Design a protein with these regions (language model features):
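Extreme N-terminal "head/tail" segments of very large remodeling/mechanoenzyme assemblies
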Residues: 1-140
């Protein structure tokens, strides 16, 4: 497996939207890179984001559930992690997102949306292979 892109929103110290494109020539040319920075810069948060998208858990925080999410940045109402990767020549995208009610920091934690997609060249779009979504109730 080769990680191609990582997109993060509000995971631990990585508040806001962040993305890294490992297909960028700056990364591709060297073949090797390091994750470095001062304490609190987001090095572990970046690795957490990758684990969350792929597995729904991290080694240091455990599984995220509908009642607990230690990875969501404090004071925010939504978190998301997306990893695009290549496995056996096929491009996949793993996505994990979770929000609080009304997208407010004090809202109740909602069920996570989890998705695994494969790139389909024929339709030039992502094809969902597996997904778990919070269903919105219909108005009566």
């Amino acid at each position: 497996m080769r990680i191609l892109k990582v997109r993060v929103q509000n995971i631990n110290s990585l508040k806001g939207n962040w993305s890294i494109n490992f297909e960028d020539p700056a990364y591709a040319a060297g073949g090797l890179f390091a994750i470095c920075g001062p304490t609190g810069a987001g090095k572990s948060s970046l690795l957490d984001a990758i684990c969350i998208a792929l597995y729904g858990s991290t080694p240091r925080l455990g599984y995220l559930t509908g009642s607990t999410n230690e990875a969501m940045t404090r004071g925010t109402g939504i978190m998301e992690s997306e990893v695009t990767f290549l496995a056996k020549g096929v491009r996949y995208r793993a996505l994990y997102s979770q929000r609080r009610a009304r997208n407010q920091a004090d809202g109740r934690l909602q069920s996570a949306n989890i998705e695994l997609s494969r790139w389909n060249d024929e339709i030039n779009n992502w094809e969902i292979l597996e997904g778990k979504y919070k269903q919105k109730s219909e108005a009566k």
